[in-house]
Amino acid sequence: MGAQLSTLSHVVLSPVWFIYSLFMKLFQRSTPAITLENPDIKYPLRLIDKEVISPDTRRFRFALPSPQHILGLPIGQHIYLSTRIDGNLVIRPYTPVSSDDDKGFVDLVVKVYFKDTHPKFPAGGKMSQYLENMKIGDTIEFRGPNGLLVYQGKGKFAIRADKKSNPVVRTVKSVGMIAGGTGITPMLQVIRAVLKDPNDHTVCYLLFANQSEKDILLRPELEELRNEHSARFKLWYTVDKAPDAWDYSQGFVNEEMIRDHLPTPGEEPLILMCGPPPMIQFACLPNLERVGHPKERCFTF
């Protein structure tokens, strides 16, 4: 009798267990594993590919712990890379250019500041040169997420004044962005998040400043997005040294460029900025104020 009950329970429970197991597998597949589980822990990631984009710009691809992992970086946040160089701990912030939907890898686009190329910085960039010299298979430590802004979708930005503050959520219909050089990476992260959602009607305006046309990072990606989403993404460049037949602006970011290529103050947009501190301090903020954009609607990464 006991054997019969055992057999019967096995027959009854087997389909139930099968359904439960199938459900758990489907659930696990629908929620990918997150790499950056704790912002206070450093995660060593392995370099698996390096692409030369220009003489001084590289795209570095790092493997996540498994092909099923995502990085786990909220839109608007960044990571820190840390390593020891000549016995000293060096830490630098970077924003990935890959999507957080990408599984198994994370991409960083980095401008390499080589030694003896800039008279004010003869030693060059410590971290960028370290990355340049990394070999495939080498590891470096990632830590994050970090940052004071998170894009929640459909025009909603959660912004904190500092790390200890509670976030204030602002909902906008348009976003003005001013980027300089490598400051394009957090902007691209937000732009992609907006444009990949057909139900997000936020309009992004990007004013992108560089020294020369050849210095424009991620130009193919930006122009592809503009061509595919011309109603929701407006793109404008300015360069210090313009080539012949240049169709965009020349010179530092000024009041006229902001008036012509960013949303008006009347639209109550959020203005995002990322670039060299002198550009933010002397070109962006004073001219935004002249145009009428209040400081409380301006955020610097």
From Swiss-Prot:
Residue numbers bearing the Phosphotyrosine modification: Y43
Record flagged with keyword Coiled coil: no
One Pfam family linked to the record: NAD_binding_1
One GO term (biological process): cholesterol biosynthetic process
Modified residues (N6-acetyllysine): K42, K50, K120
Lipid moiety-binding residues (N-myristoyl glycine): G2
InterPro entries: CBR-like (IPR001834), Cbr1-like_FAD-bd_dom (IPR008333), FAD-bd_FR_type (IPR017927), Flavoprot_Pyr_Nucl_cyt_Rdtase (IPR001709), FNR_nucleotide-bd (IPR039261), OxRdtase_FAD/NAD-bd (IPR001433), Riboflavin_synthase-like_b-brl (IPR017938)
Recorded superkingdom: Eukaryota
Keyword Mitochondrion appears in the UniProt entry: yes
Binding site for FAD: R92, P93, Y94, V109, K111, F114, K126, M127, S128, T185
EC number: 1.6.2.2
Its job: Catalyzes the reduction of two molecules of cytochrome b5 using NADH as the electron donor.
Protein family (similarity comment): Belongs to the flavoprotein pyridine nucleotide cytochrome reductase family.
Descriptive protein name: NADH-cytochrome b5 reductase 3
